[in-house]
Amino acid sequence: MSNNTDLSPVHVIGGGLAGSEAAWQIAQAGVPVVLHEMRPVRGTDAHKTEQLAELVCSNSFRSDDAETNAVGVLHAEMRLAGSLIMACADAHQVPAGGALAVDREGFSQAVTARLEAHPLITIEREEITGLPPTEWGTTIIATGPLTAPSLAEAIAAETDADALAFFDAIAPIIHFDSINMDVCWFQSRYDKVGPGGTGKDYINCPMDKEQYEAFVAALIEGDKTDFKEWEGTPYFDGCLPIEVMAERGPETLRHGPMKPMGLTNAHNPTVKPYAVVQLRQDNALGTLYNMVGFQTKLKYGSQTGIFKMIPGLENAEFARLGGLHRNTYLNSPVLLDNVLRLKSRQTLRFAGQVTGCEGYVESSAIGLLAGRFTAAEKLSQAAVPPPPTTAFGALLGHITGGHIVTDDEPGKRSFQPMNVNFGLFPPVDVPKPEGKRLRGKEKTIAKKRALSARALADCRNWLSLY
């Protein structure tokens, strides 16, 4: 690390996981940083301490398996990149099977101590109530899902009122190769061809009356997750949980998101479905499909059981389960460029959950990328995005443009927060052992190993550029 104290400092707003990682990466590159954190001057209903990188929910960083799990691959890539968050997590690990879980207090204290001790990092405990003044120059905003209202309003004013969401309306997402296409079929309602469409843009899962009634009953009876007190989220009709719609009456769903009109079962064209669940392509690769209109507050265990009642989804593998909770995140594919800068004001860069990633590790990873991109620019170097074959690149690609924009639902947003998963990675050829044809679980594991190996090799090559 060489010190470039003659450089003007980079300002980082937000001392959570992403902001802490971004500040560390910048300082490690020899560029001075001012890290602004509003706690303890102003607290939140979720945070309990004034430590940086406080974990407000679980203490788990999820799977540490870098061979067959996408988040484990992201762990490995972050370690290769000298991540502060991963170093402190490893140092404060607690037993958790194959997962990386941490002593939450020891972890956040360690992050805070490392940042406070760094000679190029200055920590300012103050609330930033608006967008940074132009004299600050390069600034990273990493204020997370609980961004203070005044700053959120300033961001909304700069970007456009519709560009900042305050609720996650998350529907489950399913791996395409786990959908039974002997039961389901491709068709858009009334064979409508939209922009970039073919008239066969949805996967349709048919139900007869008996299946529909059993499904509605299961939704009503399923275990629900209550809103956390600090979320204070009212229901609104444009984003009602699927189980709340079911409670409004037995016919509500089949006249709403499960309406069968305009659809003909390609496998049995003479029989009209009583109800239909539609799945819409979720990423440009076509490896992931989301359940249209199925935002939910059902507990995860209930979701998997109930949604596998849907014909064609009996063996569904979920890349993400549904949810509805308070959040603050940008419509990043529209607003940010491929190195996380605001297109309309390129001295501003965003990082962490405010960009539309989901999870501790993902937020930290985007903070790491934002820090590296910023440091490169300050040192008059090129900010080179990671390849899409890496976990870094797959996640960045989702945030900055890997989702599908649709015009068939006026007023609704197609971009939703996402955890890293193999469905975001470009496909890979799976090597076949001589004389052996891989099937089932064996084939799935081989595919994941191939994706992981390619990701780590490509990540090493990318890091060699810096």
Swiss-Prot record:
GO molecular function: flavin adenine dinucleotide binding; tRNA (uracil(54)-C5)-methyltransferase activity, 5,10-methylenetetrahydrofolate-dependent
Domain of life: Bacteria
One GO CC term on file: cytosol
Any one GO biological process: tRNA wobble uridine modification
Protein's UniProt keywords contain Secreted: no
Pfam family for this entry, one: GIDA
Chief localisation class: cytoplasm
Subcellular location as annotated: Cytoplasm
EC number in record: 2.1.1.74
Residues holding FAD: 14-19
Alphabetized Gene3D superfamilies for the sequence: FAD/NAD(P)-binding domain (3.50.50.60)
Reactions performed catalytically: uridine(54) in tRNA + (6R)-5,10-methylene-5,6,7,8-tetrahydrofolate + NADH + H(+) = 5-methyluridine(54) in tRNA + (6S)-5,6,7,8-tetrahydrofolate + NAD(+); uridine(54) in tRNA + (6R)-5,10-methylene-5,6,7,8-tetrahydrofolate + NADPH + H(+) = 5-methyluridine(54) in tRNA + (6S)-5,6,7,8-tetrahydrofolate + NADP(+)
Family stated for the protein in its record: Belongs to the MnmG family. TrmFO subfamily.
PANTHER family, per the entry: GLUCOSE INHIBITED DIVISION PROTEIN A, METHYLENETETRAHYDROFOLATE--TRNA-(URACIL-5-)-METHYLTRANSFERASE TRMFO
Protein name listed in UniProt: Methylenetetrahydrofolate--tRNA-(uracil-5-)-methyltransferase TrmFO
Annotated gene: trmFO
